[in-house]
Amino acid sequence: AGSLVRCSVPLFVMMTGVLLLPVGEGMGAFYRRRIGRIVPPLLFWSLALPLLFFAYLHTFGAATQSPTVDPGSYTVRQLVVRLYTFVFNFNYDTTPLWYLYMLVGLYLVMPVLGAWLRQASQRDLQLFLAVWGAALLLPYVEVAAPLLGYAGNGGNMGLWGVCDWNAYGTFYYFSGFVGYLVLAYYLVRYPLRWSWRRTLGVMAPLFAVGYLITCLLYTSPSPRDRT
């Protein structure tokens, strides 16, 4: 079922690009206004959710059926750890907050990106999106590479420069959610003049293919796991 709505987050990111790009104010003002709105709820829920998990599991823990939750691991000591380690990353209790961490990163780069977007030509944008589109295929290349005999570098299975001492490969700076911001800006600046029939004719097959690929990759074991 999750594969059906996997496109939701990219669509939310695209709406962010539609509404905010190009940034029309200074970096400091933009950061204060946008990131300032995210930090309070991030702080609140990073503290509230572990407390709620702890209270629930110590009240109804015996009835918990989730195979990923061990009520015995929710000790007072672990609760305290969860309450301060959110500064490094989200934890199991706060998994839905991953989106806010990602959104802060996008807000940080948007003023810089906006300066380029103002002077970029249509061809510039198309070239960026083409390279970004290629970068989106990297997870599938990583799945296929071991089938072709690729054994990694010193045990690290990263591609094109990724290794134990470097997490930033060739396509790192063209990868991730930043491309959805540029795609949204491009579609606003150069809108497609398609009929509804053509739009559905193109998008429905793409959605079906995306669903099948996502579903199959999540339910099938990775070639790495079979070696």
Where are each of the predicted segments found?
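Peri-membrane helix termini and adjoining interfacial loops of integral membrane proteins
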Residues: 74-78, 149-156
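Membrane-interfacial helical/loop segments at transmembrane boundaries in membrane proteins
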Residues: 68-69, 153-159
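Aromatic-anchored segments of alpha-helical transmembrane domains
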Residues: 46, 131-142, 205-216
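Membrane-interfacial loop-to-transmembrane alpha-helix junctions, especially the N-terminal start
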Residues: 30-34, 123-128, 196-203
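Conserved small/polar residues in nucleotide/adenosyl-binding loops
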Residues: 218-225
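Transmembrane alpha-helical segments and their boundary/interface "anchor" motifs
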Residues: 2, 6-11, 23-95, 104-106, ...
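Hydrophobic alpha-helical segments with transmembrane-like composition
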Residues: 12, 21-22, 53-58, 77-148, ...
